[in-house]
From Swiss-Prot:
Function: Transcriptional regulator.
GO BP annotations listed: response to nickel cation
Cofactor-binding details, from the entry: Binds 1 nickel ion per subunit.
Family in the record: Belongs to the transcriptional regulatory CopG/NikR family.
Gene Ontology MF terms in the entry: DNA binding; DNA-binding transcription factor activity; nickel cation binding
Keywords: DNA-binding, Metal-binding, Nickel, Transcription, Transcription regulation
Annotated residues for binding of Ni(2+): 79, 90, 92, 98
Name the record gives this protein: Putative nickel-responsive regulator
Lineage: superkingdom: Bacteria
Amino acid sequence: MGRTIRFGVSLDSELLDKFDVLCDERCYQTRSEAIRDLIRNTLVQQEWEDTDREIAGTLTLVYDHHKSDLAQRLTEIQHDVHDIIITSLHVHLDHYNCLEVLVLKGPGQQVRNLAQRLISTKGVKHGKLSLTTTGQDLT
């Protein structure tokens, strides 16, 4: 981590008031911590746009495992790209519905493509990809 540099920011008073409320709601002790997080989030979002850059994330899927061969099809897709799946968790929500959570890491485009393949598989009730950074370029 580099040295800390102090700099000034000019804001409209109403915008600052709203920012202070946000800081309080999210339990930031200082405005500086909140601003650092905003900058980091912007940098991470920029990473996601780079299709070749390595990213990490989770993919959650909810599906009825009684649907004909759905679990088998999902497993086959996962085996096709096992190198970007770090781990998976399978939870039985009730007699019919399962929650599957995949932890992913790999080139951005490959991660997004896998997520789309799984989410769009017939029988998947809901799917959500949540992306983050590998942290390598953040301080």
